[in-house]
């Protein structure tokens, strides 16, 4: 039999098996990202008439959302963007998750660069007829991802130390200015959010805004396989405003995503 990873089957080591599994998983993720383009009927507008730039797979996502008064959040959003409301208020979300299979179009996922942990803090905006996401901050455990996203998408990425094991996720910004701790698990079965519901408003978003509201990047994914979640969350210095009341929790096990290059807005 042929050797694998430079060893014969008899001497196949656990480390070699892990490396082989990682390689296989990266290509499985890449195939799933491409397949996401086969399902488009749920989109609020057509796919861009140009090639996407980047693929990602997101894993073990918690969506934690707080009601925030519109007037409290409005000063933290560029004037060129409309701060959206649903069920009588604006909403601020925090989402911890794992990025896997990160790759540029036509390029295989690169070891050590394709997987990392991330926490984003966001709200929901629109310009014209395009509802999307505005990020207050994005904390990532990969310095390379932080630098690339800052440069290309002009997003407020920050480098953080992130420890994630099973149901636990802990993030500490490298500069010491902010921390986040969560324990969470899914409850019930996964299903897409129904149109015209709060859940649909919070998760079914197909573009992001960057720069000072001067850039927009389209994204695409299948409808979110959303579940209810039970969680405890403690954050310090991540949200730009004081958070009050109990958050809403939702969970998704996985999502395959493609992202287009940003375009300048008029």
For the regions a protein language model found, what residue spans apply to each?
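Extreme N-terminal basic, low-complexity initiation segments
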Residues: 2-11
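A glycine-rich, hydrophobic loop/mini-helix early in the fold
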Residues: 86-92, 99-138
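Internal, well-folded beta-alpha domain core
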Residues: 120-266
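Short linear/disordered segments characteristic of secreted peptide precursors
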Residues: 11-14, 264
């Amino acid at each position: 039999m042929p050797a694998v990873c430079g060893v014969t089957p008899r001497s196949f080591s656990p480390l070699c098996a892990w490396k082989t599994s990682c390689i296989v998983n990266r290509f499985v993720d890449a195939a799933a990202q491409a397949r996401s383009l086969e399902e488009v009927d749920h989109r609020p507008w057509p796919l861009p008439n140009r090639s996407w730039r980047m693929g990602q797979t997101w894993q073990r996502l918690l969506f934690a959302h707080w009601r925030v008064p519109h007037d409290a959040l409005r000063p933290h959003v560029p004037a060129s963007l409309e701060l959206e409301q649903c069920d009588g208020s604006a909403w601020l979300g925090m989402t911890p998750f794992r990025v896997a299979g990160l790759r540029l179009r036509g390029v295989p996922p690169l070891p050590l660069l394709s997987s990392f942990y991330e926490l984003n803090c966001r709200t929901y905006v629109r310009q014209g007829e395009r509802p999307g996401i505005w990020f207050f901050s994005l904390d990532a455990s990969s310095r390379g991802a932080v630098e690339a996203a800052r440069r290309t998408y002009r997003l407020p990425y920050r480098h953080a130390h992130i420890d994630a094991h099973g149901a636990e996720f802990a993030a500490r910004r490298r500069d010491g200015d902010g921390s986040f701790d969560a324990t969470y698990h899914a409850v019930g079965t996964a299903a897409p959010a129904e149109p015209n519901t709060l859940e649909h408003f919070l998760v079914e978003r197909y573009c992001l805004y960057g720069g000072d509201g001067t850039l927009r990047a389209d994204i695409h994914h299948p409808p979110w396989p959303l579940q209810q979640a039970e969680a405890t969350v403690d954050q310090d210095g991540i949200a730009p405003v004081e958070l009050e009341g109990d958050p809403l929790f939702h969970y998704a096990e996985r999502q395959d995503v493609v992202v287009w290059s940003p375009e300048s807005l008029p």
